[in-house]
C-alpha cells in the first residue's frame, strides 16, 4: 500500500487529496516512497534496493497480544497526520501494519477504525465495521473468496483488522490490479462494478463465471449497505479500488 503523510505530500508539491494528483505526482511518489505498493510492483532501483534490504530482517510488526494498545496509538497517529496514510479508497480512516503471530509467522493487515467520541457518527461506524466483518464471514461460508477479518477493541475505538490478500507471510507479495486501474485503462467510464465487469468480459479480460461472481458481490454489497431505516447508506463503500 503506497502511503503518504502530510510531510511527504508537501515534499512532492502535490495536492493534499490523492484523487487530484497528476501522473507526474504519482510517478514521483512511487519512485521515492514506493516500497510497499499494493500488489507486487516495485518501481525504480532505489525502491528495489530498499525492499531487498528489508528482506534481510523480520518486518516491523505489532505483537498479536498488543494490538489493542498499539492500534489505539497508530490510529491516533494516523488521525494526527504523524503516520503515512494508505492511498486506498473508501470512507473509513485506516492504516497498514503487520501482526506478529509468533515464531516466524506474520500477517500484513489494513486496519479501519472509528473515532473516539461517543457520537451518532461513531455509533454508525461501529455498526458498519461489525457488519463488514460479518459480511466477510458470510461470503467465506459460501465459498466466495473474502479477506479474513477480526474486530479489535483499541481503547475508545473499535478497529476492523482485514488481512491483506496481496501479501504472503513476512515478505511475500502477490500481484493485484484494481478494477479502477484496469477499467480506466481501456474504457474510462467510472461507473459501477457490474458495468465495468461486463466491459471486461466483452473484451476477453475476465470469463463468464468471474462476471457472475462480480455481479453477485455487487448485489450483496448493496444489500449490506441498507440502513436501519431502509435507506441506502453508502455506495462510497463499493469503490473500485
Please describe what each predicted stretch is.
Residues 1-241:
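Phosphate/dinucleotide-binding and metal-coordinating scaffold of catalytic cores
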Amino acid at each position: 500500500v503506497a502511503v503518504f503523510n502530510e510531510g511527504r505530500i508537501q515534499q512532492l508539491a502535490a495536492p493534499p487529496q490523492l484523487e487530484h494528483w497528476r501522473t507526474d505526482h504519482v510517478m514521483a511518489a512511487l519512485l521515492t516512497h514506493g516500497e510497499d505498493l499494493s500488489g507486487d510492483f516495485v518501481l525504480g532501483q532505489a525502491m528495489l534496493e530498499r525492499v531487498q534490504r528489508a528482506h534481510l530482517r523480520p518486518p516491523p510488526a505489532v505483537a498479536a497480544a498488543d494490538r489493542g494498545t498499539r492500534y489505539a496509538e497508530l490510529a491516533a497517529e494516523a488521525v494526527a497526520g504523524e503516520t503515512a496514510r494508505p492511498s486506498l479508497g473508501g470512507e473509513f480512516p485506516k492504516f497498514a501494519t503487520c501482526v506478529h503471530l509468533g515464531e516466524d509467522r506474520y500477517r500484513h493487515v489494513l486496519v479501519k477504525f472509528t473515532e473516539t467520541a461517543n457520537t451518532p457518527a461513531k455509533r454508525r461506524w461501529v455498526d458498519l465495521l461489525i457488519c463488514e466483518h460479518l459480511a466477510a464471514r458470510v461470503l467465506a461460508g459460501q465459498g466466495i473468496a473474502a479477506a479474513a477479518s477480526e474486530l479489535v477493541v483499541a481503547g475508545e475505538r473499535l478497529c476492523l483488522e482485514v488481512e491483506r490478500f496481496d501479501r504472503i507471510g513476512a515478505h511475500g507479495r502477490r500481484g493485484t490490479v484494481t478494477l479502477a486501474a484496469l477499467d480506466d485503462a481501456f474504457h474510462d467510464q467510472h461507473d459501477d462494478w457490474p458495468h465495468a465487469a461486463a466491459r471486461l468480459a466483452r473484451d476477453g479480460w475476465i470469463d463468464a463465471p468471474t462476471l457472475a461472481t462480480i455481479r453477485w458481490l455487487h448485489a450483496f454489497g448493496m444489500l449490506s449497505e441498507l440502513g436501519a431505516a431502509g435507506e441506502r447508506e453508502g455506495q462510497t463503500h463499493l469503490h473500485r479500488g
